[in-house]
């Protein structure tokens, strides 16, 4: 439905809807929930909440109000249900966001997430559209959560690497979002989640009418992610992501398969992907690296060539 107050809808593959309520205020609305990817219920609540809140940061806003979405089987202990909600609440408090209630239904498998409301000035919305030739792409979190959570199920990674991936997934994009909002000339922004870096880069390129080239050798990776990918520990979602982008992707002869696999890896609560001119990316990187030292330039934007996406 067309409405002049709807500033961002579903047509541009953006992370959230944005609705203008005045000349000074626009409302950001998003929803996200999923099944557990970790055994600890409190940690699951933290990760699910961080993942849902991320969409507001990706749009250049600040989350302010949220509602719980919870699906629980009859057999799930009440202590586990409480722990899930407490984990989500802890992340909302960290974000400065109030959870005002929610809705619970019975289901065969646990699911948890948030419906989040945030605010942004109508003239300062960050969108998936707008990447320009000459821009570079900055990524604020390392890749590999899909590969590593798959490896954890088989007890293949070290306790240190396991704890590190959990910490990355539970980390809010709040500080990164603040840094991006303060940066000059940000032309486009999204967060890297289920479609992987390849999928989300393709959507940005396609919606912007440009070609994005990603550099495998510069991708920041979580500890032991490369080792697991080289062993063939690739989640099914990575193959689906590759199938999705394949018609729009040129893989150059210099590309290494392991980096291509990790670029397709579906992420949970991944980082922000930001398009801006190189001269403005350098001060942004300096700011990001004070709290996220893995932040890196992972690609660049050019005029549209044969395909929307290139990988070397």
Question: PLM ranges: what are they?
Answer:
Residues 1-312:
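Helix-biased detector of long, well-ordered alpha-helical tracts
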